[in-house]
Amino acid sequence: MAKGKDARVTIILECTSCVRNGVNKESTGISRYITQKNRHNTPSRLELRKFCPYCYKHTIHGEIKK
């Protein structure tokens, strides 16, 4: 039998430096990654350092609402 809600949910990670600077002349968009997290182990918002192809460097990508 299944237990209540699923613990694993799909989330979207978005580049914080692209969002903070706005879409300036250098960048053509905002980097987003799709991944999963376990709601029981990490109830808070997830932040990971990932490569942003628009900034051309590794930046912090934070979880956003769908």
UniProtKB/Swiss-Prot annotation:
Keyword Secreted assigned: no
* GO terms for biological process, alphabetical: translation
Tell me the PROSITE patterns matching this sequence.
RIBOSOMAL_L33 (PS00582)
Assigned GO CC terms: chloroplast; ribonucleoprotein complex; ribosome
From the Swiss-Prot or TrEMBL record, what is one GO molecular function term? Answer: structural constituent of ribosome
Could you identify this protein by its name? Large ribosomal subunit protein bL33c
Q: Which InterPro entries match?
A: Ribosomal_bL33 (IPR001705), Ribosomal_bL33_CS (IPR018264), Ribosomal_bL33_sf (IPR038584), Ribosomal_zn-bd (IPR011332)
The record's listing under PANTHER family reads: 50S RIBOSOMAL PROTEIN L33, CHLOROPLASTIC (PTHR43168), LARGE RIBOSOMAL SUBUNIT PROTEIN BL33C (PTHR43168:SF2)
Q: Sorted alphabetically, which SUPFAM superfamilies does this protein's record hold?
A: Zn-binding ribosomal proteins
What organism does the record attribute this protein to?
Answer: Carica papaya (Papaya)
Gene3D superfamilies registered for this protein in UniProt:
Ribosomal protein L33
Question: What's this protein's family per the entry?
Answer: Belongs to the bacterial ribosomal protein bL33 family.
Is Ribonucleoprotein among this UniProt entry's keywords?
yes
Give its localization.
Plastid, Chloroplast
Cystine bridges: none
- Pfam family for this entry, one: Ribosomal_L33
The gene for this chain is rpl33
Q: Which UniProt keywords apply?
A: Chloroplast, Plastid, Ribonucleoprotein, Ribosomal protein
